[in-house]
Structure formats: structure tokens, C-alpha cells
Amino acid sequence: MLENQNNFNKNSVLEKIESIESSYEYLDTLLYVDIPSQQMFFIKKGEIVDIYSISSSYYGTGNKVNSLMTPLGKHEIYKKLGENLPENAILKGRVWNGAIADIIKEPLDTDFDHVTSRILWLDGLEEGKNKGPGIDSRERYIYIHGTAEEGLIGKPASDGCIRMYNKDVIELFDLVDEKAQVWIY
């Protein structure tokens, strides 16, 4: 039963992606972030290779600067940062400050929003939607990154970025290249 359920979920996701753009299967790598399920699908040449739990914005989805919302639409990885850093390393201003985060496994929201382990910095690909004045994902510093608040993964809790478990973002970092597409819907 579980295998049938997984196949149904995968087929359902692939149908969603195909409705966005039918030529997705020609992309070497696609990261598809499904906001309703709080999951990211790692797709190679049209096949789902892995599924990661994520956390999008607590404030919902939207593309405006200073909204703290997760931007929708097609993006690409602009820059990868944090290669070879220790797991749970805290990055401030995209640079390791030498500190290691204490990971919170309970579903607790803290007063800090540490960016940890790795950063995949996103750039919008859709002029007027997630690229351009007042809505630019890259200028908003929208990332896929690790978090100290791992207990909140699986539900909206970020300030706009896509949060992942630290071990997962380290794994993903090594599997994707800059310019790989990231679709957030």
C-alpha cells in the first residue's frame, strides 16, 4: 500500500510540474518545491530521485521585497556557498562566523533564524514575477539553506527562504550545480 501511495504522490507531482511546463523532463536537474506539502522533489531527467521535507515562509507565499514570504515561480541556483563547512556551521552575510548552531529538534520557534551548513542562493527567472524591481528573489536573498530549528521542518516557519534539515542540504548541495532550476509552487 505504501509503495502505491508513493507512486501516486510522485505521479501527482509530475502531473503538476508538467502542467507548468511540459518540457521539464529535458532539464538535467530540477528541484520542485511543493508549498502545500512542504516537500522538495529532486528530479533528474524527468524522474523523481529523492524527496526532502522543507519549511517555507511562516508568512505564506509572495514575491514583494520585505514581505518575508516565499517567492513563487521558476528560479535557478545563482550561487552555492558553504562548501566543506562543518555541519550546523552558522553563516552570517553568507560567511561562516566560526560558530556551530545548537540544533533544536522540538517544534519550537526561537528568536533567531540561523542560516546553517550550506546556502543555495536563488535567482528568479520570471521578469515581473520574481525578477526585477521590488520583487527580485536574488536581491531579497532567498536561499535554500539549513536551519537550527529542525523541529519545525515540515511546516511553514521561515522568513521567506526554504529551510532544510542540515544533513539534507549538505547532501543536496553536492548533487546540484549552479544554474540548476528550482521551481516553487
Describe the role of every protein-language-model region.
Residues 1-185:
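N-terminal pre-domains immediately preceding structured catalytic cores
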